[in-house]
Amino acid sequence: MFVDQITLELRAGKGGNGVVAWRKEKYLPKGGPYGGNGGNGGSILIETVTNMYSFEEYRNLRFLKADDGQAGASNNRTGRNGKDLVLKVPEGTLLRDAATGELIHDFTKDGERIVVCQGGRGGKGNVFFKTSTNRAPTKATPGKPGEIRLVELELKLIADIGLVGFPNAGKSTLFNTLARTEVKVGAYPFTTLHPSLGLVHQEGMLYQKTWIMADIPGIIEGASQNRGLGLDFLRHIERTRLLLFVIDISGIERHSPEQDLKILMGELLAYKEELKDKDMVIALNKIDQLLPDEREERVALLKQQFPDQEFILLSGLTGEGVDALYDLFKSKLSE
């Protein structure tokens, strides 16, 4: 199951108590303070890892707790520290305080690690309180409680290429062709119900460059107002380096390609206007369903209405135009 939002209560460990104890030697039944300090409670940390793409492993959890520190002991022994708890999250995770909405951290790189809840300090044993004027202190302190925090984790996928289009535009078929995967396809809306990730590289190339591609669930008119799958997955568009709009040029499933493109761009800009500055290419898909003259006519009309856009013709089903698309990826996504 794809889980890209979750709320968790995080509880760091409590510090162990300090103890009152005395040295016991022959002929010296109370030979001075000998009680040790408590161990520190375990902290809770969050760390990004590769090859993780959702919060699925946390979906049935409501809270997580680190270990408590152990109490001190006689012979001035310090209690064992509680073990830290490290939560693994995908790159692209936003960590927020659930109570205030404050952004705590934006995890964008592998290996980032921060402390979210600090473990409580261990209490002091009576050895700590020995002074020149108080040789036999009877005081010890309890351990401090660990921090408790209610947090929200939100994932915005980080991918090189994001496939965007209406349901049944052929995105999943094209995704399968490019990433050589088996994403479910079918002739009904919302075949793709959650983002799919795949690795794209050109077969037969001596020096291959691999890109991460995300197939975003189909967007419908009104998605920016949360219709259809709506805002659930529009967030994943924000971090892709290149947006690949997949338009059904055949016009068989829906209305005209020009109208599709106009509505699609309008929905994305209504969701977040800054998306207009993102690099984008329009993939005119299903050209195998048109005669050559029909292709030329429809492409000419699209270029006339969208003169600033870059178009590429292809068929995800037959593979026509796919090599040109690989070349485009190389030129657009080169370091």
From Swiss-Prot:
Listed CDD domains: Obg (cd01898)
Keyword Metal-binding appears in the UniProt entry: yes
Chain sites annotated for binding Mg(2+): 172, 192
E.C. designation(s): 3.6.5.-
Major subcellular site: cytoplasm
Subunit record text: Monomer.
Official protein name in the record: GTPase Obg
Natural source organism: Chlamydia trachomatis serovar L2 (strain ATCC VR-902B / DSM 19102 / 434/Bu)
